[in-house]
Amino acid sequence: SNTSTVHRRVALAVAAMWREQLGVITELRNEEWKVFVANRRQRRETEVFRGGWIADYDDAGSFLDLFATGSPLNWSGFADAEYERLLGAARAASDPDERARLRGEAEARLLDAHPIVPLYFYTSKHLVSPRLRGFEPNPLDRHPSRFLRFAE
């Protein structure tokens, strides 16, 4: 749900900072997830909204492709021909270094255009015994026990 206590605390903190530092008065609106998604898809007027994404595969495209023209999750409405060209070239690149370079250029272009403002990043910490085998860090922070075992 988009109505979690953590999201509300972040929104209140940002609103307070904007009021104190910039003189910007905000009106906070808390929406259930289904309402939030429907409003974004219908492009209902909202000047700022909180969104989040966790990569479901280990590639920068998991984030960058969200802002491609035509992406159903491009709720910001961002559209930029050079960004599209860079994404397409990165998808077509067979060399990993070239692909990373192109994705880096696309990311810089996206951030320079300001359709998003990264506020924070989810992190996780695990204390793992050196004897534990099968524990692999991953973007979703999921660790099925069927893959875990202790070494002798």
Where do the protein language model's features map onto the residues?
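Short beta-strand-to-loop elements that line the ligand-binding cleft
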Residues: 25-32
